[in-house]
Amino acid sequence: MIIDAHMHYFKIEGFDELAKLAEHENSRWGWQEICEANQIVFSVAMGNSYDAPCRFGGVTPRLINLGGEPFCAQPYNQSDNVGYCLGVQSEEITPDNAEKTAMEFEYYLQRDSHCLGIKFYMGYQNVYLYDPRHEPLFELAKAYDVPVAMHSGETANHHGRLRYSHPLTVDEAACRHPDVRFVICHAGNPWIVDAFEVASKNENVFMDFSGLWEHRLTPEREEEIEDFQKYVRMWMNYHGIWDKIMYGSDWPLINIPDNIRNLGRIVPEKHWNEFYYDNALRVYSRIKVCVAEVFRDS
């Protein structure tokens, strides 16, 4: 069984096009077919949509909407086997609205077991993860025992500022907040060595291996990435933090069978259970309740 610890569940034309390049369909049913064909029992979607109503005068979280527009928490109108992280618009948070923003986020954490964590889009948002404006959200993550995930590494467009997305910035936040779990998304690629060091040093830091390649992988492309895979596996073996690495796809960016197969070439088979399932269940701890409900209803 597999838990996809990093994907997207967002209806937008750009994602529709990405799905086509990966030979998939960016739709609720398209994702369900993928899950059934590849033993994916649950998925963690990163919040992208901007349809959250403002209730407390703060900056609203980005949600998911591929399962139904607009998003609804009660009753939950997305797929039961898809949970989500609340996306943060860091540049809009100010000292005046930071506490009210936390109230906007807490609304979902209080009411929806599918709300699994908080996602920061560093690099796309020109703010460091450890900026004081984020403190109320870190306190919220601690109170509700949910992880903080951070976009790390390269950005999908040239507008991104890479200094904000470097995995070393997670070290600063993790040291200041030892009671909060942090996830370095995309393994910090291309700064994978740095990401491994941050996760190895800090007990509260984990990594997801999503978005390392894109589209459908041709035989020629798979041959081209062999050296990269060996490089990642070398550092994975060196650090041996098998309880800190999680499978992710960044769907609809990548063809799912291609992704599962190629990540399986990096992670030794004896650690597949941890990588593909166990670690995500522990890091995103609310998944346990959701998975139990999925199996009960199936």
Locate each region found by the language model:
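Active-site gating/metal-coordination segments in enzymes
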Residues: A52-Y164
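Active-site environment of divalent metal-dependent phosphoester hydrolases
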Residues: F10-E13, Y50-P53, E91-T94, Q125, ...
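Alpha-helical scaffolding within the catalytic cores
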Residues: E25-Q32, L63-A73, E99-F105, H166-V170, ...
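Mid-to-C-terminal alpha-helical segments outside catalytic/metal-binding sites
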Residues: M1-F42, R233-M234, Y238-M246, P252-S298
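Divalent metal-dependent hydrolysis catalytic cores, especially in the metallo-beta-lactamase
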Residues: E17-A22, W29-G58, N81-Q89, L116-G117, ...
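Active-site neighborhood of phospho(di)ester-bond hydrolases with catalytic His/Asp-centered motifs
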Residues: I2-A5, V44-G47, C85-G87, K119, ...
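Catalytic pocket-lining loop regions of alpha/beta-barrel enzymes
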Residues: C115-G117, Y130-M246
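N-terminal cationic-hydrophobic initiation segments that often serve targeting/anchoring roles
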Residues: C35, A73-N77, L109-Q110, A174-C175, ...
